[in-house]
Amino acid sequence: MIAVGSRAGAMESANDTTVRLYGYGTYVGYRMHPQWEVENPCIELDGGGVVFGIECWWGSEQKIRDSINGREVVIVPPPDRSP
């Protein structure tokens, strides 16, 4: 687990050739997910929006950068939580 206020990254998915990346931002601790009404790790993304741990693969920014390991990166928008 990383400390609140630390840099973090979040991936939607990955395979052998491609990483679908929500982006990088700040880990802000546990927050209430607006739809599932459960507290979950929350990352405020630099590009705007938030992503919750239950919606992605996440970790420290360095860990995520290292895990990309030369694969193509496709930036994807944060999850749409509109009804």
Where are these regions (language model features)?
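Short coil-to-beta transition motif at edge beta-strands of beta-rich domains
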Residues: 1-20
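Intrinsically disordered, low-complexity, charged/polar segments
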Residues: 40-83
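Short beta-strand-centered aromatic/proline hotspots
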Residues: 17-32
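A short, compositionally biased
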Residues: 3-5, 35-40
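Residues that form ligand- and interface-recognition hot spots within folded domains
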Residues: 12, 31, 47
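Glycine-rich, flexible loop segments associated with nucleotide phosphate handling
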Residues: 21-24, 37-42
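Hydrophobic beta-strand residues in large extracellular and virion-surface proteins
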Residues: 8, 25-27, 43
